[in-house]
From Swiss-Prot:
Residues 1-21 form the signal peptide. It comes from the Eukaryota. This is Venom protein family 1 protein 2. Belongs to the insect vpf1 family. Expressed by the venom gland (posterior main gland) (at protein level). The keyword Secreted applies. It comes from Platymeris rhadamanthus (Red spot assassin bug). Disulfide bonds join 70-150.
Amino acid sequence: MAKLVFISFLVASFCLIGCFGGEAEIKQFWLVRKNAIFQFRFATVEIEKTIYQKVKHILVKAKDDDQKNCIDGVKSEAIIESRAIVKGTVGKILPAIDEVSEALRTGDENKLKAFNNNWNYPEYKVKELANFKLKAAALAPTVQEKLDKCVA
């Protein structure tokens, strides 16, 4: 009798895992999506904060409208470049996430399986965050140099 109960328990467990195993993958994907969007937004804020701090500091030194216009132009270029950096590093995964999200909303789980096969998110996150930090650190002196030329 005990063996029959144990075997029934095992069969029921495997059935539950089979039924809800995909559900765990879906929940994990939504957590990855949430984290990827957070990382993208956080990186955007960090790099733009650096630019705005540099602009604010140099704007005090501007004496006429030509210098202020030059500073504004440098700021605009830096913001465009910073967004390209963010999209090229921590934001590379977002188009794939959007595609899978849309597929899951319609009930198609095939894109999720392809996403899981193509992306190792923890590894990607570490690698691209380090890459982002390097590129953001390289952008700051370039922006500062251009801003200094505006008020020279």
